[in-house]
């Protein structure tokens, strides 16, 4: 998948809550241009997690989380990414015609 100039691949992984001491559903790994997603996710959790990590990739590739940027604090980045993801998905789900309009623009 292309995000800006980067090609990002998806990697569906087994979660390791004990090893990682984390309950995150996904993670953008910038150095490897990779998004890891827990492979047992389905439905809305999968959709939300994929878009959430894509937005993290956009934030990183836009330098918004670099020194001096508005999202240098990880907590702020997570709050912004989570809010944008949830609102954007709501817009798409409540307005399915919008997806069709966006697909027409790209063809």
Listing of model-derived features with the role each one plays in the protein:
Residues 1-45, 61-107:
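Metalloprotease/metallohydrolase-associated module, dominated by Zn2+-dependent proteases
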Residues 48-60:
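Active-site recognition of the HExxH zinc-binding catalytic motif
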């Amino acid at each position: 998948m292309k995000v800006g100039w980067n090609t990002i691949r998806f990697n569906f992984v087994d979660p390791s809550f004990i090893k990682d001491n984390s309950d995150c559903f996904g993670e953008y790994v910038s150095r490897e241009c990779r998004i890891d997603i827990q492979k047992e996710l389905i439905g809305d959790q999968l959709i939300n997690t994929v878009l959430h990590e894509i937005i993290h990739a956009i934030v990183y590739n836009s330098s918004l989380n670099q020194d001096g940027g508005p999202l240098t604090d990880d907590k702020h980045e997570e709050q912004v990414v989570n809010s944008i993801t949830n609102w954007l998905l709501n817009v798409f789900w409540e307005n399915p015609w919008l997806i069709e309009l966006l697909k027409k623009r790209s063809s």
